[in-house]
Amino acid sequence: SARFQIHGSARVMHEAAEVCGVDPFWWQVDARSPLASTLDAHRVVLMDTDPQMKEEGVELRSPRKADRISGAMSYHWVMQAIEDTMRPAGDPLRSNAIVTGPINKLAWSMAGKNYPGHTELIAKTLKQRRFAMMFVGDKLRVVLATVHIALNDIRDVLTIGKVHTAIDL
């Protein structure tokens, strides 16, 4: 069975769970702890960066407001997920895939991280020239031919070649 690793802040995760009326269902461990690699018995593990942030004097203010710190931390968590996919086979922290939610592009920009989204960050980090965003559901899988483009601009950007590339990927 799959093990899911969540990179983030335990405080923010608990606040979000409370707002959404969800009981926390994850096991939590300090992201730097050697225990992080031994938690195979737990299906969902939150790799908590709060202790490290506290030591470094970094405090996430409101999880509902864009600022430089939240942008830097969001970027850091995505980079951690990417790095986990690049770990060697057999490494207990290796990930086979990354699942993401939306990022706050304003917060990333405030942190000096100028990417239209994490799709482009993942592609650049992994040195990929051909890449696409994919949505996966129970009955439907969709690979997008364009990403991060305003609807009004699609008619000027979408080409047969882009559609074929998406199909090929």
Task: Name each region found by the language model.
Residues H118-V143, V147-N152:
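Flexible loop/hinge segments that line or gate small-molecule binding clefts
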